[in-house]
Structure formats: C-alpha cells, structure tokens
C-alpha cells in the first residue's frame, strides 16, 4: 500500500467513525460536575476512573470529560485496552465523535502483530491506524523501525502497512537499513527505501537511488536497486610488513557498481547478486589469508554467487562477467609468483574463487609483460600460474579456426596452434600443433616449447619457405628441432620432402637465422613451376662463412 492509500484509509476511518457511540463512564471514585468559563458542562473525575466505548476500555487516575462534545482528557497510569491491543501513555485525549485518540508522553501501543513507541500518537482505533511522531520505534515481523515519524494502517492480513520518515533505521537479525523515507506495503510484503538508502548485511554495504526489499514468509527473498547500484564489502587479510617484521592484519574494501542490481536470498542470507549496465567489480584475492593482489573486472552484466564458509558466513564463491568483459589483475608488491599487471578481455569471463581458476570465452585477449595471447577459450589456473588456451571449451567443436590460440612474444613472430600452455611465473610454455615464422621460413611442429628467452624446441617439426605451411610444396622434416632466435636452427635428423615425397636425409642440419648477419648453414631453396621446367626447386645449397662479416 502506498502513502496516498495509507492517508486515504486514515481519512475514511475518521468519516465513518463519526456516527459511532460515545464514551460511557463506568466508574470513578469522585465525580464532580462543573461549568467552565464558556458555560459548558465538564465532568471532573478522580480515582479508579474507567470509561468504555464499544470494545475499548480506558482507565486512569484522573480526567475530565465534556459529554456534549464527546471530548475527554485522561492522565495518571492511563491505559486503553481493546481486545488484545493495549495503549499506555502519560496522558490521552479522546474525541468520541471522530473516534480519534491522541496519546502524549511515553506512548506505548502493543498489538498481537506489532508494537509501537513514540512521544506522540494520533490513533484511529476503529481503523487500527495512526500517526506516531517523536523518537518512534515500530516493531513488526522481526523488524525494529526507528524514525521521526511513522504513519501506519493495519491490513486485512493483520500486518501493518506504514510510511516511516526522518532518519529511518530498520533493524533485522541479518541486516541494518537506513534511509530518509521508507514505504512498506503489508499486502505485497515489499518495502521501498528512498532518500539515500543503505543496507548493511554480512559486512556488505549496499546503496543506490532506491532499494526495494521483497519478503517471503517474513524472510527477505529479493533486494533490488533500480539505479546507481553500489556495493562495498569489507574483508581482512594478512600483508607482509617491512623486512624482518611479521605479517600485518589489514582491511580491504571490495567494490561493485552497476546501473541496476538484483540480489536473491535464501533464508534471509545472500545467495546471488546480479549487476547490470556498466557493471564493475574490484575484488581482492587471498591465499591462506595472505593478500595476493586485486582484480578489477567490468562488463554489461556481472553475477556473483555466494556460499557459506566454515563459520556459516556467506562469501563470494564465483564471479561471472558477460558482455564486453574486460579486466586487470594487479599483483601485490610482495607477490612472488606473478610480478606484473595482467590485462585481459573476452565476451564472457568466469572466476571460481575456491578453485582459484578463471575461464575466458570468445574473442579472448590477454596481455602480460611482453607477451600477448589471442584465443577463443582460455583457462587460467592461478595456484599453478598456468594459462591453457584452446579454440573452444573442452568437448565443443571448433567453429572458427581463427579462434585457435595465437601467442606473441616481443621480438618474435606470432605462434598459432591447436592448444597452448603458458607459465606466468617463469615464462615457459608449449604449443600443440603450432606454426610460426622466422625470417623467410615457416615452422610447424606437433609440439613447440620454449626453454629460454631465445630458444624454441620443436617435436616432429617441419621447416619450409613455402607459404603453404599446412600443405607445403616442399619442406624439411625433423623429429627434433632447436631454434635459437636470430642465430640458427638445428635439426636432427632431417629429411627433404617434395610434395610429401622424401628425397634425401641427413643426420643433422643447421639453418642460419641471422636477421641480416652472415652465418654458416643450409641455404633454403625456392619452389617454382613453368611450362618448360615443370615443378622445380632452385637455390638449395650450403653457405660457409669464416666470420659474420664475410661478404658484408
């Protein structure tokens, strides 16, 4: 029920009550009839005063009553009882004609479904509604609402709809909410928090333009922030002190934002959170409670799943980023395994916190130090500091060959293969069924591994200057190749193939790769075809240089 409906109900209650019966005196130890200065009759009553109207009974120590106007004032242990409802206050003023009771001082209204305390209460007894002002405390369904003013009306389901304003605080077992104004509809069981609303639960602080709370069976089931959603989450972890010092327990603030937020709860505890529209997260990573670094991610939609830990406290279990996902991982300065920032992007990114793994899918790009990885699918194992890249997730057929992993290191030609494994700590990696280029030649191997900054090892590889690398006109084949960048290539044994047919072999061979320098080794031929000669190889030979400056 909205505010207008609440106020309308209060107005209707006043109108319909005007035809009701008046207060009737039941008892008073002393009754004195007097005429006031305006010539109106007034009853002064003292000692065990008791009045009744319908099901309502008022008792007090003293009071006065204007019978003609139906107005009475009562003080001294004042109490009004109606069925299971009890109202107490320092003093009470009644208007029988309008069925309005005004309570002053230490007001306390207790009902079977709710309780209320305030300094002032305008109470419509027949409609079971009212307006409480001054240090209001309203208790209902496990909630304690404090505010400067509360307007309420009891609904057909016995719960009360209300509007609370002025420094509102809502206390529940699992959470605390604050705002300038809140409206609760008891029939739909939905609260709207307005004017700088904030909800704090399990160390998380949620805020936005508005916060909507939907309850089911007296438990919060869904929290919605329709605009400018923001979450701040306090966490603790150990950081390394200065040299020789012990680790220090420090506080970290995870941060999440989005245009819209939806949080789903089970038994009142967070189960999942979905951020939509320019969503971002800042999440701090720990290993054995020791801070490792921070991860910043953004995308169209970010979904967080929560799970209870050993202490039953809910913590983030996984993060899923969809739609233009991108992020940055910044390792702590004390981290030993990864020393530099990792930049990455993909169509979707999924983090598993307990498994310490990340999965990136479709149009994946990862930049780390002097290396670049482009692929259709990448799995990062943070505990082992490994990246595993393939064109598509396991068990899914490759739809686009261009999604096969392509790995580039500074100073080297790109390498593409069916799969890639790369160690972020030591820079070593391997490519299955990989291809790459060095100078004028192309290399392909069942497995290509790097063992130093300038060394590649190739198993069951081929080398050719033909640009048809997948099906070359000619090539040299070898079980093992060792490529030393900008120096030479060593192969053993080596066989020359023409059109897939072996021509001759050697125990080993050395090919120069000097980027313009002179070096002894085989000179690769070129392939050609014409009407006079047919298919041919031209230029195969061996060059011996006494030193690198010969013929320069």
Provide a role label for each language-model segment:
Residues 1-23:
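Bacterial Sec-dependent N-terminal signal peptides
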């Amino acid at each position: 029920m909205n505010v207008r409906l609440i106020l309308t109900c209060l107005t209707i209650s006043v109108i319909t009550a005007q035809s009701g019966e008046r207060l009737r005196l039941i008892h008073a130890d002393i009754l004195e009839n007097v005429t006031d200065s305006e010539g109106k009759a007034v009853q002064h009553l003292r000692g065990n005063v008791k009045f009744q109207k319908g099901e309502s009974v008022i008792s007090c120590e003293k009071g006065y009553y204007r019978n003609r106007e139906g107005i009475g004032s009562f003080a001294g242990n004042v109490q009004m009882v109606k069925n299971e409802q009890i109202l107490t206050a320092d003093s009470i003023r009644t208007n029988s004609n309008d069925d309005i009771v005004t309570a002053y001082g230490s007001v306390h209204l207790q009902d079977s479904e709710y309780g209320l305390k305030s300094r002032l209460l305008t109470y419509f007894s027949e409609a079971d509604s009212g307006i409480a002002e001054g240090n209001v405390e309203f208790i209902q369904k496990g909630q304690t609402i404090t505010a400067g003013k509360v307007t309420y009306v009891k609904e057909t389901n016995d719960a009360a709809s209300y509007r609370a304003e002025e420094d509102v605080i809502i206390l529940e077992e699992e959470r605390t909410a604050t705002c300038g104004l809140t409206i609760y509809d008891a029939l739909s069981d939905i609260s709207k928090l307005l004017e700088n609303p904030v909800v704090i639960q399990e160390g998380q602080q949620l805020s936005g333009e508005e916060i909507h709370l939907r309850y089911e069976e007296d438990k919060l089931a869904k929290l919605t922030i329709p605009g400018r959603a923001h979450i701040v989450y306090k966490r603790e972890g150990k950081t390394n002190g200065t040299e020789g010092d012990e680790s220090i327990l420090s506080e970290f603030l995870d941060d999440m934002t989005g245009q819209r937020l939806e949080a789903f709860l089970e038994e009142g505890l967070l189960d999942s959170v979905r951020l939509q529209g320019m969503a971002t997260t800042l999440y701090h990573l720990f290993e054995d409670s020791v801070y490792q670094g921070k991860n910043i991610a953004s995308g169209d939609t970010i979904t967080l799943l929560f799970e209870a830990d050993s202490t039953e406290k809910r913590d983030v279990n996984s993060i899923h980023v969809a739609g233009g996902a991108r992020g940055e991982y910044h390792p702590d300065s004390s981290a030993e395994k990864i020393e530099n920032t990792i930049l990455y992007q993909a169509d979707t990114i999924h983090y598993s916190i307990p498994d310490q793994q990340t999965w990136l899918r479709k149009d994946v790009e990862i930049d780390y130090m002097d290396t670049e990885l482009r692929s259709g699918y990448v799995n990062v194992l943070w505990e082992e500091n490994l990246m595993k890249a393939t064109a598509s997730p396991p068990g899914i057929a490759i739809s686009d060959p261009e999604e096969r992993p392509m790995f580039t290191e500074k100073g080297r030609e790109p390498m593409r293969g069916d799969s890639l494994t790369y160690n972020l700590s030591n820079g070593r990696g391997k490519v299955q069924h990989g291809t790459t280029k060095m100078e004028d030649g192309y290399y392909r191997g069942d497995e290509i591994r790097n063992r130093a900054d300038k060394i590649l090892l190739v198993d069951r590889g081929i080398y050719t200057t033909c640009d048809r690398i997948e099906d070359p006109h000619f090539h040299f084949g070898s079980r093992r190749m060792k490529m030393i960048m900008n120096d030479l290539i060593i192969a053993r044994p080596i066989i020359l193939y023409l059109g897939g047919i072996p021509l001759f072999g050697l125990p080993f061979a050395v090919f120069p790769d000097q980027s313009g320098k002179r070096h002894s080794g085989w000179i690769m031929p070129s392939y050609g075809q014409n009407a006079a000669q047919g298919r041919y190889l031209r230029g195969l030979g061996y060059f011996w240089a006494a030193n690198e400056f010969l013929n320069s």
